[in-house]
């Protein structure tokens, strides 16, 4: 008897690192007439994306509108997000240091597009919100996969651009109360909690003392 490799209730989740849009990528995709073709970008990843129940990606760019720009202040063409969703990415992480690259209006425009993708492709997004109601609905984000309720919490160490005091907001590691509330909700409503933190020291393979402290706090809570 040949037995299946995985039980029927096995959930496969794949996590992908920073999805970005640098200037050279924008130029390469452009046809010179305000149209952009990204169809070759993730073709070699197709097999990995197709056999997962959930594909999680850190969306480290904004959809802030024109002019489209790469590093250090990212704004990608809108159809890049369509392409990503069409490839099979279905959980977009928004809490990272580039989410406010185009200011509050850039965040709002980005999340407006993600809401459209949620309707058209069934994607999820978390880590940033335009108002309290959206924040409360997606923090934690609880997804039912094959009958297993999994909570996702996304936060960042900081942002490169000034955030302001009001909405929109992104989840910060330093905001312990917001994280504690999300963790408590996850504990009561989900069977498994996954915290996705945008942190680390660039070009270093060693974590810092503060990152270790934050990790211990998250594990304890």
Regions found by a protein language model. Give the residues of each.
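Acidic, metal/ion-coordinating pockets
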Residues: 1-221
């Amino acid at each position: 008897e040949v037995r299946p490799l995985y039980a029927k209730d096995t959930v496969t989740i794949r996590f992908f690192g920073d999805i970005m849009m640098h200037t050279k990528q924008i130029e390469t995709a452009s046809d010179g007439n305000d149209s952009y073709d990204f169809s070759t970008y993730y073709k070699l990843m197709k097999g990995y994306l197709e056999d997962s129940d959930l594909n999680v990606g850190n969306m480290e760019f904004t959809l802030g509108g024109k002019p489209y720009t790469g590093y250090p202040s990212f704004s990608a063409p809108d159809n890049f997000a369509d392409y990503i969703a069409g490839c099979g990415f279905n959980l977009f992480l928004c809490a990272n240091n580039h989410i406010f690259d185009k200011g509050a209006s850039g965040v709002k425009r980005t999340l407006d597009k993600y809401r459209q993708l949620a309707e058209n492709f069934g994607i999820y997004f978390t880590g940033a919100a335009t108002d309290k109601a959206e924040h409360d609905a997606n923090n934690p984000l609880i997804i039912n996969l094959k009958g297993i309720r999994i909570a996702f919490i996304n936060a960042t160490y900081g942002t490169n651009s000034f955030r302001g005091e009001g909405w929109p907001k992104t989840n910060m590691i330093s905001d312990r109360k917001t994280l504690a509330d999300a963790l408590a909700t996850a504990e009561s409503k989900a069977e498994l909690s996954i915290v996705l933190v945008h942190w680390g020291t660039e070009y270093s393979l060693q974590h810092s003392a503060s990152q270790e402290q934050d990790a211990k706090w998250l594990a304890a809570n």
